[in-house]
Each structure stands twice: as structure tokens, then as C-alpha cells.
Regions:
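N-terminal strand-loop-strand
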Residues: 1-36
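The catalytic Nudix box helix
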Residues: 36-69
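NUDIX/MutT-family hydrolases
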Residues: 90, 101-135
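Short, charged, intrinsically disordered terminal tails
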Residues: 143-149
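Short aromatic/basic micro-patch
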Residues: 35, 85, 116
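Active-site segment of metal-dependent pyrophosphate-handling enzymes
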Residues: 60-99
Length: 149
């Protein structure tokens, strides 16, 4: 059984007293299917580098890596019927610059829309269970960080 490795990010921005998360609507998915930016780890790249690259390609944003949040592991079935074991490493990334939705033309086919969502709503709005869990971890991390101040 083949293995597949990807990396993604929970990109956060603090604005007007609230935390916001960068989410995408992947190309060809129904409206309301919100996900986190992610992609396959290329040979020679680290998962962290992949996560930062995917953020820029799929949202138009540039961020700074804060920490690894965890891995999401699952099986899926390819169109040819083959099973694949997939591991997606997710990282917490702080927004540095860029305008959400300014997606480079060569990656526009991958994403129908990119938008800031309130972080506290992300566990409810994200379509995939593992990504909801990563958003919840990011929310917990930020709550602990604010308590420490």
C-alpha cells in the first residue's frame, strides 16, 4: 500500500481583538467546503517548508512558522481502487504579510476562494475532522499564550 505525505498550516492573524484563520475552498468542491491550505511534501523539502509554500500558493499570504500542531493520519481510496495511507503534518503559522485571495495564477485552479474565518468558528466551519482538530489545537495554543502574558 502506498504512503503519501503532505503538510499544511493553520494561519492566524490577530485583527480588531480577534484571532482569524486563513481558510480555502479547494477547487471543484461545493460552496461551504472550507479547508486548510496543504499540499504534498516534495522530495528534498521538509514538511515545515512545504506548509509555508502551500500557504503562499493557496492563499497569497506569507507567514512565520510558530510550531508543529500535530499529524492527521487516514486512509483513502484512489480512483483506480488502490488504498493509500496519508499523513498530513500541520503547523501553526502567524500571518506576516499579503492579501488573502491574491493567489498566483499558476495555482488558481487549486483554490476557488480564500478567506479569513474567525478562529473560534473554525472547528465548526472546516469540512474535515482532522483539520477541525488542528484548528482547535491552534485556538488552545493561543488561549494559553494569552494567559501567560
Amino acid at each position: 500500500m502506498p504512503n503519501e505525505f503532505s503538510a499544511g498550516a493553520v494561519v492566524l492573524r490577530r485583527l480588531r481583538g480577534r484571532w482569524w484563520l486563513a481558510a480555502i475552498r479547494p477547487g471543484g468542491k461545493p460552496k461551504g467546503t472550507w479547508a486548510l491550505p496543504k499540499g504534498n511534501v516534495a522530495r528534498g523539502d521538509s514538511p515545515a517548508d512545504t506548509a509555508l509554500r502551500e500557504v503562499e500558493e493557496e492563499t497569497g499570504l506569507v507567514g512565520d512558522l510558530v510550531r508543529k500542531l500535530g499529524d492527521v493520519k487516514y486512509f483513502y481510496v484512489r480512483k483506480d481502487g488502490g488504498r493509500v495511507f496519508k499523513v498530513v503534518s500541520f503547523f501553526l503559522v502567524r500571518y506576516r504579510r499579503g492579501r488573502i485571495g491574491d493567489i498566483p495564477a499558476e495555482h488558481a485552479h487549486e483554490v476557488d476562494e480564500a478567506r479569513w474565518l474567525p478562529l473560534e468558528d473554525a472547528p465548526r466551519l472546516l469540512a474535515y475532522k482532522g483539520e477541525r482538530e488542528m484548528a482547535a489545537k491552534a485556538l488552545e495554543h493561543e488561549a494559553r499564550a494569552r494567559e501567560a502574558v
